[in-house]
Amino acid sequence: HWDDYLTELGVVYDPFLDEMWTAKSGGKARLNGRVIRVSETDNLESSVVSIGFAKSKTTLKRNLPLFARLYQRVLKVRLMGSAALALTWTAAGRLDAYRENGISLWDIAAGGLILECAGGEFWRQPLRGKYTYELIASNGRLRKRIERLI
């Protein structure tokens, strides 16, 4: 269960873009040493949202209809392929929100801390199975609107 763990330090490296994302609990989030902040987008119609698909039939059944609903309501939907990068891109304002169901703790712990230190909201809920979560990560302005689509 998530509450049993506390992330003190988050580091995510993207070797393709040579980008290092870092944050220390209580501090500021940084990209290659420069402080980053989440976007200020406050409506779905102007937002860029990433959705992730964990490797399970249940997740696929649940997320495909959500993908269709998001596609009709947001500016753009993106599939990052990496939970850590979707979280860090949300932290830097490249994305406005990220949604995934059935993701593992080790995929989201570092990026979640980086997002929170950048002023974002990292909402997560434990699911059945060890260290598995449902999450909505956002700039702090869009979670409730995304929840209504779920």
Give the ranges of each region predicted by the language model.
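Short secondary-structure boundary segments
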Residues: F53, N101-I103, Q125-L127
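Acidic donor-binding loop at a coil-to-helix junction in glycosyltransferase catalytic cores
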Residues: W106
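CN hydrolase (nitrilase-like) catalytic-core segments centered on the catalytic cysteine
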Residues: A97, G102, A110
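Acidic, metal-binding active-site segment of PIN/NYN-like and related structure-specific nucleases
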Residues: G119-L135, N139
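Alpha-to-beta junction loops
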Residues: A92-A97, G119-E121
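Short active-site alpha-helical segment characteristic of glycosyltransferases
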Residues: V49, A110-G111
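Acidic beta-strand-loop-alpha-helix segment within the catalytic core
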Residues: H1-A86, E134-I150
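Hydrophobic residues within well-ordered alpha-helices
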Residues: T88-A91, G112-C117
